[in-house]
A protein has these predicted regions:
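Accessory terminal regions of nucleic-acid processing enzymes
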Residues: 20-24, 147, 183-222
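Short catalytic/ligand-binding loop motif for oxyanion handling, primarily in non-cytosolic enzymes
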Residues: 26, 34-35, 118-120, 161-165, ...
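Hydrophobic/aromatic-lined pockets within catalytic cores
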Residues: 30-31, 118, 138-142, 201, ...
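Mg2+/Mn2+-dependent nuclease catalytic core
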Residues: 84-191
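Conserved aromatic-histidine-acidic binding/catalytic patches
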Residues: 42, 46, 121-125, 203
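Residue-level signal for well-ordered alpha-helical scaffold segments within enzymatic catalytic domains
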Residues: 28-29, 53-56, 109, 132-139, ...
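Metal-dependent nuclease catalytic cores that hydrolyze phosphodiester bonds in DNA/RNA
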Residues: 1-107, 117
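Non-catalytic, well-ordered alpha-helical scaffold segments
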Residues: 48-52, 131, 210
């Protein structure tokens, strides 16, 4: 296929898009073929509650290891990067929304709230997402939010643990929380995106993934 096309990436689509099935990801980005599945609304509710509670509070509420700063969790505008280039000088752009950031005295930390099991494995799952947010905000399109310098990144995980009380109408749910720091590495991210662009610019689509439900469904109906 022609290599002059400029692909736009969403930071959240790497882990559950490209990593899940390269065939389906290729069809989505190259041919516009997308199977849309509803996102459980309960996670959006949790996300909203978390952002509302932590907005304007101290970073120390997330982790004592973080430098003192104010949490900003009410920025709801889309973010857009300038035109970026991979290791083969192929252009691409990025766009998406952040959960929040911490405003320190001389720097910023990007944070993302996750309602998920608490495990260090989540660092690897969400590394490209957080690294992408940082790159977008340090190299924004004109008019998009610019934060500089962004020295730290991380995910703040919420894992429901138990119900302490109930009266028939409501209940108190406790959640364990954990901050996981993610290393900022722009070169590693560009290398990763270069690999994605190699797949998307190939004349041949990736093979179907035997562990992908959509690929297996396609086999049965074609």
């Amino acid at each position: 296929m022609a290599t002059d096309r400029i692909f736009n990436f969403s930071p959240s689509e790497f882990a559950f898009g490209f990593e899940s099935c390269q065939k389906c990801y290729y069809d989505k980005k190259v041919h516009g073929i997308v199977l849309r599945t509803p996102f459980p609304s309960i996670f959006s509710k949790f996300d909203s509650l978390q952002k509302n509670y932590y907005h304007t509070k101290s970073s120390k509420l997330i982790s004592q290891d973080l430098e003192e700063g104010e949490i900003v969790a009410n920025y709801n505008k889309m973010l857009y990067s300038e035109v970026l280039y991979d290791n083969k000088k192929r252009p691409f752009t990025m766009s998406g929304k952040i959960d929040g950031y911490i405003k320190h005295k001389d720097s910023f930390t990007v944070i993302d709230f996750k309602t998920t099991s608490i495990s260090e494995k989540k660092i690897y799952t969400y590394t490209t997402q957080l690294q992408s947010y940082a790159l977008m905000m340090q190299k924004p399109r004109k008019g998009s939010l610019k934060l500089e310098p962004i020295n730290r990144l991380g995910i703040f995980c919420f894992d429901p643990s138990n119900i302490s009380a109930t009266n028939g109408k409501d209940c108190s749910i406790y959640m364990n929380t954990k901050w996981f720091e993610i290393k900022r590495d722009d070169q590693s991210l560009i290398k990763y995106i270069s690999g994605i662009l190699e797949v998307l610019n190939s004349e041949e689509a990736p093979k179907e993934n035997p562990s992908c439900g959509i690929c297996n469904f396609r086999k049965k109906i074609i």
